[in-house]
């Protein structure tokens, strides 16, 4: 009996594609206010508070679906994940505008996340890093830089 229930919970790839990837999308599909969404962190199990849910959206992170259970990533675990990925999967570093040569694309077309908090860098943040000659790191085949919030941790404002 438990095996049948377990088999019924397995999610197919087609069904997975139809599930919402954002908290906003989830709240709309459930017909509930965004503020009422309680989503556990995939790593520590703590429920994201309202501010963390908003940060999750601003960072353009995607929800994680395991069977039909949804998970996100809290602020603390975003930082821990970023650090772990950097330490385990570092590939290369380039300075400033050299990222365009390394990636073979314009800075406007390159997706870059913050190496500290995983926020998605906007064009102003990317140009700021280029103009200051700050490092961009290739980690797990993705580019990392430093966002406007985290650069204050490095006393670089």
UniProtKB/Swiss-Prot annotation:
Purpose of the protein: Plays a major role in the induction and maintenance of cellular transformation. E6 associates with host UBE3A/E6-AP ubiquitin-protein ligase and modulates its activity. Protects host keratinocytes from apoptosis by mediating the degradation of host BAK1. May also inhibit host immune response.
Main location: host cell
Family: Belongs to the papillomaviridae E6 protein family.
This protein's record includes keyword Transmembrane helix: no
A GO CC term attached to the entry: host cell cytoplasm
Keywords: Activator, DNA-binding, Early protein, Host cytoplasm, Host nucleus, Host-virus interaction, Inhibition of host innate immune response by virus, Metal-binding, Modulation of host cell apoptosis by virus, Transcription, Transcription regulation, Viral immunoevasion, Zinc, Zinc-finger
Record-linked InterPro entries: E6, E6_sf
Keyword flag GTP-binding: no
A molecular-function term among this protein's GO annotations: zinc ion binding
Gene of this entry: E6
Entry's Gene Ontology BP terms: DNA-templated transcription; regulation of DNA-templated transcription; symbiont-mediated perturbation of host apoptosis; symbiont-mediated perturbation of host ubiquitin-like protein modification; symbiont-mediated suppression of host innate immune response; symbiont-mediated suppression of host type I interferon-mediated signaling pathway
SUPFAM superfamilies (UniProt xref): E6 C-terminal domain-like
UniProt-annotated location(s): Host cytoplasm; Host nucleus
Name of this protein: Protein E6
UniProt cross-references to Pfam families, sorted A to Z: E6
Disulfide bonds: none
ZnF (unnamed) intervals: 41-77, 114-150
Assembly description: Forms homodimers. Interacts with ubiquitin-protein ligase UBE3A/E6-AP; this interaction stimulates UBE3A ubiquitin activity. Interacts with host BAK1.
């Amino acid at each position: 009996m438990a095996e049948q229930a377990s088999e019924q919970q397995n999610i197919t790839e087609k069904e997975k594609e139809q599930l919402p990837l954002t908290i906003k999308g989830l709240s709309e599909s459930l017909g509930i206010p965004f503020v009422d969404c309680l989503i556990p962190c995939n790593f520590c199990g703590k429920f994201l508070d309202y501010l963390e849910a908003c940060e999750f959206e601003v960072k353009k992170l995607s929800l994680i679906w395991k069977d039909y259970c949804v998970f996100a990533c809290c602020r603390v675990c975003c930082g821990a994940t970023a650090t772990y990925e950097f330490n385990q999967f570092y590939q290369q570093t380039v300075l400033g505008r050299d990222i365009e040569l390394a990636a073979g694309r314009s800075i406007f077309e390159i997706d870059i996340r913050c190496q500290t908090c995983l926020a998605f860098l906007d064009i102003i943040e990317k140009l700021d890093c280029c103009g200051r000659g700050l490092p961009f790191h290739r980690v797990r085949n993705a580019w990392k830089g430093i966002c406007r919030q985290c650069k204050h941790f490095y006393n670089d404002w």
